[in-house]
Amino acid sequence: MLCTGLPGLEMQRHEIEHVLRAAAAISNETSFVLVGSQVVGLLIDSPPGELLVSAELDLYPSLHPEKADLIDGAIGALSTFHDTFGYHADGVGPETATLPSDWMQRAKIVYLGDITAICPDLHDLAVSKCAAGRPKDADFVRVLLRDHLVDLETLQQRIAKLSVTAGAASVIADWARRRATEARP
């Protein structure tokens, strides 16, 4: 079954691994930072399907982020890879996700054969979604909170560590609180 990014057609772990293998072959790199929602497919054994609706894996080579453009061109959106498999890589950079300054201290390392995936922990990933603040991010954060995969107190602490103005941090924290309220049954 192809992953199309539609509810009920979630990107599976083997598809994430496929994208990583293809990215490694294209970039001649073996270590990648993953920053998008599909990180949950590597961090949680049986994640709620609502968290896996994206058909893209946001990543960049950890040692040579500039090679993300090669990945994007070869297996990105609208590529033959995407047309064939229904999912794709989104070659991004270190600046793409707004993460706490110390996120790497908590990063989860996932070894997939010869490939290393460096993933923000779930709270740091949720913080990046709070900072982005799009409707799809609201849905994502609500599910994390609803299913007790993250907690609001830790989110608030991590938001305070963002390299943003105090005003921006306050807006992001308020946004997270609203998602927590919405997540309550």
Model-based region annotation:
Residues M1-P185:
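Compositionally biased terminal segments of proteins
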